[in-house]
Amino acid sequence: MHTAALKQNLLRNLSNLPGWRTRRHIVVIESDDWGSIRMASHESFRRLRDAGLPVERSHYNRFDGLESDDDLAFLMETLAEFRDSTGRPPVITGVNVVANPDFDRIREEGFAAYRYEPYTRTLQRYPAHAHVEALWHEAADRRLIVPAFHGREHLNAARWMRALRGGNRSTLLAFECGVTGIPRRGIGGEEVPNFQAAFDLDTTADLADQQEVLRSGLALFEQLHGRRARYFVPTNGYFNGSL
C-alpha cells in the first residue's frame, strides 16, 4: 500500500476513536442512494450506449434505478422472515436522497437556474411506484428499513449546471434522457465531471449553494419521512468541514 493510502487509512481509523463503542458483536447493514434516479429507463440506457457513452461498463448504470413498489415489498418480506435472539428482525439503514432534478422546468427556463422536485413527485412518472412512499413509512414503523439522510439529491447541482451551460455533449444528451450519473469518459473521449459528489467543491462560492442544499434537504427529509434525520452520509463521501 502506498504511503498516501496508508496515511488516509490511519486518519480514517483515528477519526473513529471518539465515537460510540460496544463489546457486542453487531452487523450493520447500510444501503444508500434510495430515492435517486441513476438510470431513468431501459430506453435511456440504450440511447446513451448507442451514442457512444460507455454506460454498459458501469454496474450503477446497468442496475441502479429508483426503487419500485416490488423492490420495497419484497425486501420487507425477506427481512421479516428472520429474527435475532430477542425476536427482532434485521434493520437496514436506508440512506436516502429526497429530491431529483426537475428536468422539464430546467429545460423550459433555458438552463438559467437549477430546479429540483421531491422524489415523491419523481415517483409519479414511473409505472410501478405508486406505493413507494407508503411502503417507506410502513418499513420504518416496523423497524425493517429506517431512513437516513444522504443529501438533497445525489448530484452536484452547481457543477452539473456549469457543464450543461458550457455545452458538454455527453451531459446534454444524458439530460435529455433524464440521467445525471454518467461515466467520466463521455462521447468520443470527452471529459465528464463527477456529478455524483454533491458536496465536492469547484470554488468556495459553491459553499453557499451547498449550505442551502443541506438546509432545504433536511427540511424536506423531515417533511417526507415524518422525523428528523439523525444520521448523515454525504454522497460519494466529499464534505467540507465549514459546512
Cite the ranges covered by each PLM segment.
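Catalytic alpha-helical scaffold of carbohydrate-active enzymes acting on polysaccharides/glycoconjugates
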Residues: 2-231, 237-243
